[in-house]
A protein has these predicted regions:
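Conserved glycine-rich Rossmann-like NAD(P)H-binding loop of the short-chain dehydrogenase/reductase
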Residues: 23-39
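The beta1-alpha1 cofactor-binding region of Rossmann-like NAD(H)/NADP(H)-dependent oxidoreductases
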Residues: 53-63, 96
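Conserved glycine-rich cofactor-binding loop
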Residues: 9-10
Length: 247
């Protein structure tokens, strides 16, 4: 089996690469940060093919997929993990550049990678597309605005993709985590570790390994089983009450 992972240089992506490589699965680990990828490849050995890829570059996606070595060329599982959140300001004060970057990465990047790899899966009559969504796509919160909307897109795209692929043998799963302690909050707050650490203060969040284990489980079900959606949260997280303005 061969697994293609985007955003594999850290967080969920690196954990997914490690989890599948532990089974002897071939892994194409793609990301922008080549130094991190080199370390991952050195750690995991010959079962990993590391390749530089910015999912916002459509031409690069086409080139990378076309130039995969023969032993990594037939992708069985695509894990669309690359994504980010930027800022937590209300919509009227949000930076449009941040919104554009989230849409370009979380939505357009995901569909471009999917479109590049999907024809091979359909031709072979097997495959699995695993998309990383978020509970933010279902449950709104102040400052979530564009980020939550991009993850709602991932959820709906996954369902429609499943409908399109009915009868092809290709499966589709949306994995939708809640609070997880990765670089997510550090990126959201532009490297401010104090703000990032405060997000998880006093509670036990999910880990990257928790999410990687969930993805691995979904992707290794028998071929007649399709896991449509998995929503997972830390036990300490639940659903916020509706907001009410008083006075």
């Amino acid at each position: 089996m061969t697994v293609f992972v985007t955003g594999a240089s850290s967080g969920f992506g690196a954990a997914v690469a490690r989890r599948f490589a532990a089974d002897g699965t071939r892994v194409v680990a793609s990301a922008r940060r080549t130094d991190r990828l080199a370390d991952l490849a050195a750690e995991l050995g010959s079962s990993v093919h590391a390749v530089e890829l910015d999912v916002t570059d459509a031409d690069a996606i086409t080139r990378v997929v076309a130039e995969l070595p023969d032993e990594f060329a037939d992708i069985d599982v695509l894990v669309n993990n690359a994504g980010l959140a930027l800022g937590l300001e209300p919509a009227q004060r949000s930076d449009l550049t941040d919104w554009d970057r989230m849409i370009d990465t979380n939505c357009k990047g995901l569909v471009h990678v999917t479109r590049a790899i999907l024809p091979g899966m359909v031709e072979r009559g097997r495959g699995h597309v695993v998309n990383l969504g978020s509970v933010a796509g279902t449950y709104p919160y102040p400052g979530g605005n564009a980020y939550g909307a991009t993850k709602a897109f991932v959820h709906q795209f996954s369902l429609n993709l499943r409908s399109d692929l009915h009868g092809t043998g290709v499966r589709v799963t949306s994995i939708e985590p809640g609070m997880a302690d990765t670089e997510f909050s550090t990126v959201r707050f532009s490297g401010d570790e104090t703000l990032a650490d405060a997000v998880y203060e006093g509670m036990r969040p999910l880990t990257a390994d928790d999410v990687a284990d969930t993805i691995h489980w979904a992707a290794t079900r028998p071929e007649h089983v399709n896991i449509n959606v998995i929503e997972l949260m830390p036990t300490a997280q639940s659903f916020a009450a509706f907001q009410v303005a008083r006075g």
